[in-house]
Amino acid sequence: MGGGGAAAFAIFDRDHLRLLNVVNEVYQKYAYDLELFIHCSLDIVDEKAPKANEMFLGHLYTDQKYKSFGFITNTGVRMILVLEANNLDWKDFDIRAIFKRFHSLYCNAISNPFHTFGEEIRSKALLDAATDLISTHVEA
């Protein structure tokens, strides 16, 4: 495992269709575990969303390896950030800023006239930002 970094970042639409899923290459051998963890986190988003006062849902779930944070847009798009459970570097403020940035990138991506709703997002800016995010603070 890495040194307390981001393991994955995913975006799902309101019908739980995956729009973007980026897994740090250090965690590729754990891709199935991460997939299950992300889906557990999505269930928690569904529980928290109706009661939420803001789009940032905060910490969602933790197990022995990972912890997740969530964000839901006003159109029901869900964003999940998965960090290593031992990550103490990224504070709540940092994670809020990450989601705010990705919300903006998402809005730009879907504003592209060539984007088809319900299909995976093919935005270079969004993919590059997600790849940079999960590459931060990771030691192989």
Question: What kind of feature is each model-predicted range?
Answer:
Residues 1-8, 14-140:
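Acidic, low-complexity cytosolic segments
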